[in-house]
Amino acid sequence: MAHLGSRRRMSPGLRTRIAHRKAHRTPPSPLIAEPDEMMGKAHELFQLCDKEDKGLITKRDLQRLQNELPLTPEQLEAVFDSLDQSNNGYLTPVEFSMGLGKLLGVNLSHEEEKENSMMEETFESGWSDGPDEEDDAEEMLFSATMEHLGASRIFQEHKEIRDLWSRLRKERPELLSHFEEFLYRVSSYIRDVHHEKDTLEQALKRKETDHGREVRCLYEEMEQQIKIERERLLKKVLIKGDHGLKNYSHLIMSKV
């Protein structure tokens, strides 16, 4: 699924809590400098994937790392699937950074893991400025999902579909993929029906055009035949008239 939209902003309270935590934490030891470096690299990779500044990345976005990581497209898909623990089709910055660090074997200290866990909770609770932005983000995700399924023109304006999709995503995520598969099949069927309808209309138009052409040809042939017949009859009348005139002249001459 390709998700479009504006990047959600970090709330002022979140910035203050992060700055306070950084100011009071103990200096990192050489043992945990590598994880910090890894998290920074993960952030850079996330930015490379998130060219549109959506605030999250999809499986397609992750393919942009082919030039950065020695991984094939199939391996990148496998990486995405392993990081997408919630099976919602996208990764947040926290999910990507934490998951990538674990995937590459970076061992965090107990204190660092605890802090990252707190950071993750902070991100979850403070990333958005309010419910309106969350609704906008979900609406954009739904739109992107429908676009990916090829169903945007069919189901985009159906509020019932939108509400059911949102409810499954929040309450029954294990059923969401089945619902999206159903939408994909229905939209594919509707597109096929529309294609057949368009094909039939084009065939009828061609048939009408061919029929009109045949009618015009018949009309032209009929006009030509009428013209020939008219000329033949006129010629016949002229011949008869000329013959009658000659007979009449002979009759007059004989009487004289």
Swiss-Prot record:
Name recorded for this polypeptide: EF-hand calcium-binding domain-containing protein 4A
Domain EF-hand, residue spans: 41-69, 71-106
Question: One Pfam annotation, family name?
Answer: EF-hand_7
Organism this protein belongs to: Xenopus tropicalis (Western clawed frog)
Q: What does the similarity note say?
A: Belongs to the EFCAB4 family.
A Gene Ontology molecular function term of the record:
calcium ion binding
- Regions of biased composition (Basic residues) lie at 1-10
Which sites bind Ca(2+)? 84, 86, 88, 90, 95
Q: Coiled-coil annotation: which residues? A: 190-235
Q: Which UniProt keywords apply?
A: Calcium, Coiled coil, Metal-binding, Repeat
